[in-house]
């Protein structure tokens, strides 16, 4: 027997039994962004490698260790996209969507990072994100946070996540802080781990994000970024906090929050949870006012967020919030005998005219017991049975598969309306 080919490590199938939960989540995401007036954008899975080097930063874990990069037959370096923001900016610049315009966009699709696979973290993962261009005010920072909060409410997990906020200031303020931080780190270099020593000059703000408890203890005495912010950056952050308080969104200021991508400035945020074991991030984002210009466009204010859907699905399953997810079939239609098959097919087609009703027809014949077994296995709530007697009388037998109710006889011409009320 030939050896079976398996899925690539860290790249998982979503099976038919899992798809309804994914479909529910995706529907909630689409409905929520539509309520805010956002438009969908779809970009290629493969982009020029330079796009991510210039946007994410060459001395980030993603670019250094995690990107799937290859040379095509022309020798061009291409990369499977590791995140969605850079591609959205590239598309906006290329098609003239951004300069002197306001755009509110969203995307959803697969991303790729060569990470160590673990619970809630995969090498191919599905990401949902929103990106807003052309609005400098903190009002829009608040809007995307209100949108994310609304998502948690609609999914029933708002009590299981918390919002962490920080501000990184503008480029000049960060440069001044960077110098002060490097000076501090140089004084304690021998206490830093190898990773932090490597980042001390190339990307010192990332040292603040170190997961090493000894490094975090040392950073308690480090200079604070907030002390280097000017009046405008402080005002932007204060206005954001004021708006969040006005709409009742609780938050916690985390001065160590810097995010893992180089393009952020001013507002950065993460929604975190401890429902998945160790505290984990389920949504993250911030402002990236310099990225559009960095990628060849005119300087344009921008803000956005992204979330990995696998983690949200895992969270819904962990919290047992999947009971209201409907299966793929509501009604299973059967025919007892060859003469009844055409009638059964017609009945199934009529039922499919009912908006949202999911109907499966039995195919291939078989006795009553076999067909009822298939009906039960389908997960349907109702089975429609058409035998010779029902056919002669213009009726169907309606069997309840998930409730203790007596079988009913229903006229074929009123069946669709009757079933619509039941389902």
UniProtKB/Swiss-Prot annotation:
UniProt enzyme class: ligase
GO biological process: one example: histidyl-tRNA aminoacylation
PROSITE patterns: AA_TRNA_LIGASE_II
Stored InterPro entries: aa-tRNA-synth_II (IPR006195), aa-tRNA-synth_II/BPL/LPL (IPR045864), Anticodon-bd (IPR004154), Anticodon-bd_dom_sf (IPR036621), His-tRNA-ligase (IPR015807), HisRS-like_core (IPR041715), HisRS/HisZ (IPR004516), HisRS_anticodon (IPR033656)
Source taxon at top rank: Bacteria
CDD domains documented for this protein: HisRS-like_core, HisRS_anticodon
Pfam family name, one: HGTP_anticodon
Broad class of the protein's primary localization: cytoplasm
Gene Ontology molecular function: ATP binding; histidine-tRNA ligase activity
Subcellular location: Cytoplasm
Record field: catalytic activity: tRNA(His) + L-histidine + ATP = L-histidyl-tRNA(His) + AMP + diphosphate + H(+)
Disulphide-bonded residues: none
Subunit record text: Homodimer.
Protein name (record): Histidine--tRNA ligase
Organism, as annotated: Shewanella loihica (strain ATCC BAA-1088 / PV-4)
